[in-house]
């Protein structure tokens, strides 16, 4: 899905607006580790690949920034398992 996703560093999240609804992937950054804490997509928008796009944007940012990732969010953890090319980002 091709969405305009914004990195809102001040709010520690990646976000997009779809059909007037804010969708987010929240994270916490500490000592070079991006802990992905939560994804939120309203139920009416589920199944459209929005959460996947948000997580992909967060992981791309982590890679480009030299960050490691801790997927505390179940969705982010499952996404990383499905996209094994991202597993090298995991915190040891």
Regions found by a protein language model. Name each.
Residues 57-92:
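C-terminal structural segments of small proteins and small subunits
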Residues 42:
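Residue-level recognition of the GNAT/N-acetyltransferase active site
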Residues 1-39:
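N-terminal first-folded block
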Residues 11, 46, 66-68:
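Intrinsically disordered, low-complexity sequence elements enriched in Ser/Thr/Gly/Pro
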Residues 45, 49-54:
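Conserved acetyl-CoA pyrophosphate-binding loop and the N-cap/start of the following alpha-helix
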